């Protein structure tokens, strides 16, 4: 099965405010607004790839970010996500990047975050209140 970022096709700046999610066959995993998803990718690129988008995690950052992930690349994406999750644990929540294209942009909630958020690996929570990385893993597992 193919994993898709639903509702955006090819991800563009002008549609970041649309609701998005991961779609695998008939399964839909709600994420939230496109600008939230862009923040996840921006945070990874800025903190883990020295701002060089896709240089360390090309399957997730390039292929999936463009809208689809081929079934043949799901295992690679899972391995990349494991590394991302592990490495984000070393960064405090204040290292979040809302928009790598404009580093002055801040999350709508500012610094007002839950005490449960201890690092960037558990910073991102979907619009359904679920841990983003857990939902991402679930979608990738379903896509196998």
Residues of each region from the PLM?
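Acidic (Asp/Glu-rich) sequence patches and key acidic residues
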Residues: 2-138, 142
